Structure formats: C-alpha cells, structure tokens
Amino acid sequence: MGLLWDFIITLLIIWPPYVANATPVVASKLFKRRTPIDFGRNFIDGRRIFGDGKTYEGFITGLLAGFVIGELTYIIVAKTVNITLELPAPLTVFIMCLAALLGDLTGAFIKRRLGLPRGAPAPLLDQLDFLLAALLALWLVQPSILRVIYVIIAVLITPPIHLATNAAAYLLGLKREPW
C-alpha cells in the first residue's frame, strides 16, 4: 500500500512503547511517594545508578498503561479497519513495553556514567533508548512483524515526536526541562 501505509503501521507498532515511556512522567505527579528503582544507591563509580527520576511507581504505571492502551488501540483498529493487520500479539506488546522501560533505564544508567545529572540532555540517547529496546524485543519475540522500513521510519520520526511531546509536558508543568 505504499509509504503512507508503512508509516501508519509503524505508528501502530510503536504506540504501546511510546505510551509506556511517557506515562512515568504523568505518574510522577500522581504519586506522593516515589521509590527510586536504585533505592538511592550509587554505582562503583560513586554516582547514582539511575537517579531519583526512575521510580517503581513510574515503571509499573508505564508498563501497565503501555500494555492496556496499546491493546485497546489494537482492538479498536482491528474492528474499524477492514484490512487484516499483523500487529504484535498481546504478550509481545507487554514485552515491548517492558523493553522500552528497560531501555530508558539503560539510557539513565549511561547518562549517570557520563556524569550527566538528572534532566541533562543527551541527544539521540534520550530519544532512542526506549525505542531501540522495544524494537529489539519485537524482533526477538515476533520477528515476522518487524520490517526494515518500520525500523527506519520509527528511528526517523521518534526524535521529533519525543522532543515535541517533552516540550508539551514541560509547558503543562509535568517536566522540569523541555527536552
């Protein structure tokens, strides 16, 4: 069906990890108590492992929201589009959301090792850590769905989408930094 169809399928595939990655920002405003995943501990280099911004509350909320909203989206799309779509299976969606959040944690770990404080920009790492982890999970669990064009489109569109949504979150008072 062409590039437009590939673009739409790409958005559908990456939608659950996008939701999983964005939800912890909102969750941080909903929970009064936030428990850092690293429990405030430092790594062998003396720096925090992940930092205060990575919490169990955000991780769990992101995982659940990504899975539920992603699956609901797939159900709605499947019922409204008369074309058979091969989308990730429910277990794959869950694993992709988990991988996205683990990718984000990996990005935070790398930033701390580089001496970057919480909220400091790390171009491309900030925008692609979660996406690449989710796509890797999809490739490992349900490789028949992942086409090279979807990866290319996802990698090209994610940085501007990520920057735009972070700027919106900043303007809404959900984030301290616009990136």
PLM regions: where:
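Transmembrane helix interruption/hinge and helix-loop junction motifs
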Residues: 140-148
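Interhelical loop and helix-boundary elements at the membrane-water interface
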Residues: 1-70, 74-136, 148-179
